[in-house]
């Protein structure tokens, strides 16, 4: 089934060229089906690039998904046209009285910034708190995972000395967990972060189900028992060249970044990178939509109730 997005959203043309089924709002309105409502809080600077990446992963599901885009505040963006934000993004005040099946909170380039120094930290806390009573399942990605763990478990920020960048091997720990259905025992996924997610630390200080870890990258995937909060510390949504673009950017800014691990053939940045994580990313999002959202959400979102959710796996 397709994703439903505004007809004029730039991502629509990109996805159609990839033979991804994008349904127009007009056609979707004629179907007698209750689509899933998914809200994306986009915290990344290059919003058009990021929204396209997430929409691509949401499209690979038998479920019809209505996607709405949310911005954290009304400050002008240096990397996204104001017209685009005005046309396709909503303010929190416009959605706070509604319920959603799913919420995705993207990463943000704030790895070395303390939470209290993030200009929109209080607003982000408000949205995360709101999600508890208005969203069936929330997916926290990269920096958002660290922010979510701070809000839900009051975990302090832990930072690596060197940035983690590259494509890392991971192994699964609960093969029968719904979020892991269809996963290989070992899989690859990209990381680009300073945050440190130690399996031992999370196991000691939270009751999370730790689903996948890496010897080098730490915890990659974890969920609360009720699957209403899913934490992904990497970037399964990344395009093949995203890590490359970040590497070139950091070089241009006079930094001395390490070459992303297991990314360029022969570790040579002159060689085009190979996307070895694409199938994993699609499966992860498909499982989240099916088992954490669709199987748990009420048919009538107007009668949303936290007590209605089962905690069975």
UniProtKB/Swiss-Prot annotation:
UniProt site positions, description: Important for substrate specificity: 192
Q: Which organism is it from?
A: Vibrio vulnificus (strain CMCP6)
Q: Which UniProt keywords apply?
A: Acyltransferase, Amino-acid biosynthesis, Cytoplasm, Methionine biosynthesis, Transferase
SUPFAM superfamilies referenced in this protein's UniProt entry, alphabetically: Class I glutamine amidotransferase-like
Residues annotated as catalytic: 142 (acyl-thioester intermediate), 235 (proton acceptor), 237
By what name is this protein known? Homoserine O-succinyltransferase
According to the UniProt entry, its GO molecular function terms are: homoserine O-acetyltransferase activity; homoserine O-succinyltransferase activity
Q: Which domain of life, per UniProt?
A: Bacteria
Q: What is its EC number?
A: 2.3.1.46
Pathway(s) of this molecule:
Amino-acid biosynthesis; L-methionine biosynthesis via de novo pathway; O-succinyl-L-homoserine from L-homoserine: step 1/1
- Lyase listed as a keyword: no
GO CC terms for this protein? cytoplasm
Q: Which NCBIfam families is this protein grouped with?
A: metA
Enzyme group, top EC level? transferase
Q: Where is the organism placed in the taxonomic lineage, from the top?
A: Bacteria, Pseudomonadati, Pseudomonadota, Gammaproteobacteria, Vibrionales
């Amino acid at each position: 089934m397709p994703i439903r997005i505004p007809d004029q959203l730039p991502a629509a043309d990109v996805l159609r060229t990839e033979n991804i089924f994008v349904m127009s709002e007009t056609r979707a309105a004629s179907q007698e089906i209750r689509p899933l409502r998914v809200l994306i809080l986009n915290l990344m600077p290059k919003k058009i690039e990021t929204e396209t990446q997430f929409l691509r992963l949401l499209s690979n599901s038998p479920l019809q998904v209505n996607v709405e885009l949310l911005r954290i505040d009304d400050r002008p963006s240096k990397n996204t046209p104001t017209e685009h934000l005005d046309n396709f993004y909503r303010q929190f005040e416009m959605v706070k009285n509604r319920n959603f099946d799913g919420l995705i909170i993207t990463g943000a380039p704030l790895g070395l910034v303390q939470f209290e120094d993030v200009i929109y930290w209080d607003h982000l806390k408000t949205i995360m708190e709101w999600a508890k009573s208005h969203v069936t399942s929330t997916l926290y990605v990269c920096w958002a995972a660290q922010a979510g763990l701070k809000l839900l478990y009051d975990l302090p920020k832990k930072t690596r000395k060197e940035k983690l960048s590259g494509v890392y091997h991971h192994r699964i720990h609960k093969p029968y967990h719904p979020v892991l259905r269809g996963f290989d025992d070992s899989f690859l996924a990209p990381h680009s972060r300073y945050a440190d997610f130690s399996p031992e630390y999370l196991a000691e200080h939270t009751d999370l189900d730790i689903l996948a870890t890496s010897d080098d990258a730490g915890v990659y995937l974890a969920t609360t028992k009720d699957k209403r909060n899913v934490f992904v510390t990497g970037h399964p949504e990344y395009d093949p060249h995203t890590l490359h673009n970040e590497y070139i950017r950091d070089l241009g800014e006079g930094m001395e970044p390490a070459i992303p691990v297991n990314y360029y053939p022969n570790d040579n940045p002159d060689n085009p990178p190979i996307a070895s994580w694409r199938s994993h990313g699609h499966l992860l999002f498909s499982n989240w939509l099916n088992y954490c959202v669709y199987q748990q959400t009420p048919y009538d979102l107007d009668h949303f109730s936290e007590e209605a959710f089962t905690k069975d796996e």
